[in-house]
Every structure is written in structure tokens, then in C-alpha cells.
Amino acid sequence: MIQPQTYLEVADNTGARKIMCIRVLKGSNAKYATVGDVIVASVKEAIPRGAVKEGDVVKAVVVRTKKEVKRPDGSAIRFDDNAAVIINNQLEPRGTRVFGPVARELREKGFMKIVSLAPEVL
């Protein structure tokens, strides 16, 4: 459950460390983003010489949330942090590596490149 002003960890190697959600890109009046949703975010913390720098406005896809995601089989999954992967306008990851596990819901939403880069899919 990500809403505007929420800080997220960045789970890739674009150089950003923390981003803040500005807008949820899901319908005209969506309040919250969950796993697999695209958000617009501002880079709040970045390492030097990265692909993105502090203050950049980027698109990102949410890959982990603290709030549990309910699945059709009745199970639920939650993670220890809120995390996202920075993407370009074609919805492909800007980085070449993804850190930490990602949720299976990304496969259903069409983010196959992120799923293949992730070390673990839960």
C-alpha cells in the first residue's frame, strides 16, 4: 500500500537508494499502489556517478510492500520493506541488476524482465 509521500528503497543498480512516491499511475483516482503498480517518484537519496541523481523524477514499479498482498488461493505475502525498481517509459528496468526477492504478481502484470533479473521470486 504505497501512497504519495511514501519513501521506498530502490532494488536495482541505477544509483538511487531512496525514492519518494509522487503519484500512483493506476486509473484516474487511485489512492494506493501495491505490488506490480507503476508510480511516479522523486529520487531522494543517490550514490555519486549513478544513472540517476537526486531530484530526478522517475517512473518505478513496486516490487515489495510491507502491507500483505492477498492471492487468489487464499495465501498472503508480505515483505520487510517497501521497494521499487526504476523503469523507463517503455516499462523496462533502467538498471541491469535487481536486488532482493520480488513478488510473483510482477509476472502477471507483464514485468518479465524484472522477474528474470531478480534472484528470487516469491
Curated annotation (Swiss-Prot):
<keyword id="KW-0687">Ribonucleoprotein</keyword>
<dbReference type="GO" id="GO:0070180">
    <property type="term" value="F:large ribosomal subunit rRNA binding"/>
</dbReference>
<dbReference type="InterPro" id="IPR019972">
    <property type="entry name" value="Ribosomal_uL14_CS"/>
</dbReference>
<dbReference type="GO" id="GO:0003735">
    <property type="term" value="F:structural constituent of ribosome"/>
</dbReference>
<comment type="subunit">
    <text>Part of the 50S ribosomal subunit. Forms a cluster with proteins L3 and L19. In the 70S ribosome, L14 and L19 interact and together make contacts with the 16S rRNA in bridges B5 and B8.</text>
</comment>
<dbReference type="InterPro" id="IPR000218">
    <property type="entry name" value="Ribosomal_uL14"/>
</dbReference>
<protein>
    <recommendedName>
        <fullName>Large ribosomal subunit protein uL14</fullName>
    </recommendedName>
</protein>
<comment type="function">
    <text>Binds to 23S rRNA. Forms part of two intersubunit bridges in the 70S ribosome.</text>
</comment>
<dbReference type="GO" id="GO:0022625">
    <property type="term" value="C:cytosolic large ribosomal subunit"/>
</dbReference>
<dbReference type="Pfam" id="PF00238">
    <property type="entry name" value="Ribosomal_L14"/>
</dbReference>
<dbReference type="InterPro" id="IPR036853">
    <property type="entry name" value="Ribosomal_uL14_sf"/>
</dbReference>
<keyword id="KW-0694">RNA-binding</keyword>
<keyword id="KW-0689">Ribosomal protein</keyword>
<comment type="similarity">
    <text>Belongs to the universal ribosomal protein uL14 family.</text>
</comment>
<dbReference type="InterPro" id="IPR005745">
    <property type="entry name" value="Ribosomal_uL14_bac-type"/>
</dbReference>
<dbReference type="GO" id="GO:0006412">
    <property type="term" value="P:translation"/>
</dbReference>
<keyword id="KW-0699">rRNA-binding</keyword>
